[in-house]
């Protein structure tokens, strides 16, 4: 024997969250805990909370991007509920998904019925044909 003592075993690796491993911002561990506590099923697979967190993160990012565009169109730098309402109702798929959802302080979409708009005059058109 060389008489030299071992320098110790492997150091414990720094803990990595499941959100970090999946490359997500949404908390996979919290989603898993909520699925278990909600009694949705007797058993919850390991991939289920990852998938659900990814779906929630995608939908949130999509809505926030459209709401940010609506805020920028209104020359604002802060997203308010009105911008969320405009973003969701102007997007066909999001409107279908969130059709029965009421957004507090969201207002309504501006919409004027075609019959209420002023009639186009024919006098301008007739003068050009002569």
Curated annotation (Swiss-Prot):
SUPFAM superfamilies, per database record: Histone-fold (SSF47113)
Positions where N6-lactoyllysine occurs in the chain: 10
PTM annotation, UniProt: Deiminated on Arg-4 in granulocytes upon calcium entry. Monoubiquitination of Lys-120 (H2AK119Ub) by RING1, TRIM37 and RNF2/RING2 complex gives a specific tag for epigenetic transcriptional repression and participates in X chromosome inactivation of female mammals. It is involved in the initiation of both imprinted and random X inactivation. Ubiquitinated H2A is enriched in inactive X chromosome chromatin. Ubiquitination of H2A functions downstream of methylation of 'Lys-27' of histone H3 (H3K27me). H2AK119Ub by RNF2/RING2 can also be induced by ultraviolet and may be involved in DNA repair.
Motif ([ST]-Q motif): 127-128
InterPro entries (alphabetical): Histone-fold, Histone_H2A, Histone_H2A/H2B/H3, Histone_H2A_C, Histone_H2A_CS
GO cellular component annotations of the record: female germ cell nucleus; nucleosome; nucleus
Keyword Ribonucleoprotein: no
Listed Pfam families: Histone (PF00125), Histone_H2A_C (PF16211)
Swiss-Prot/TrEMBL keywords: Acetylation, Chromosome, Citrullination, DNA-binding, Hydroxylation, Isopeptide bond, Methylation, Nucleosome core, Nucleus, Phosphoprotein, Ubl conjugation
Family: Belongs to the histone H2A family.
Protein name: Histone H2A type 4
UniProt source species: Rattus norvegicus
């Amino acid at each position: 024997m060389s008489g030299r003592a071992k320098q110790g075993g492997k150091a414990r690796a720094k803990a990595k969250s499941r959100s970090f491993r999946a490359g997500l911002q949404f908390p996979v561990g919290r989603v898993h805990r909520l699925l278990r506590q909600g009694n949705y099923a007797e058993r919850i697979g390991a991939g289920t909370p990852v998938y659900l967190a990814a779906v929630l993160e995608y939908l949130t990012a999509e809505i926030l991007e459209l709401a940010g565009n609506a805020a920028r169109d209104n020359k604002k730098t802060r997203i308010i509920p009105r911008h969320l309402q405009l973003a969701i109702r102007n997007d066909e798929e999001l409107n279908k998904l969130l059709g029965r959802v009421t957004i507090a302080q969201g207002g309504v979409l501006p919409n004027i019925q075609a019959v209420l708009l002023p009639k186009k005059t024919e006098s301008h058109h007739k003068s050009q044909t002569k």
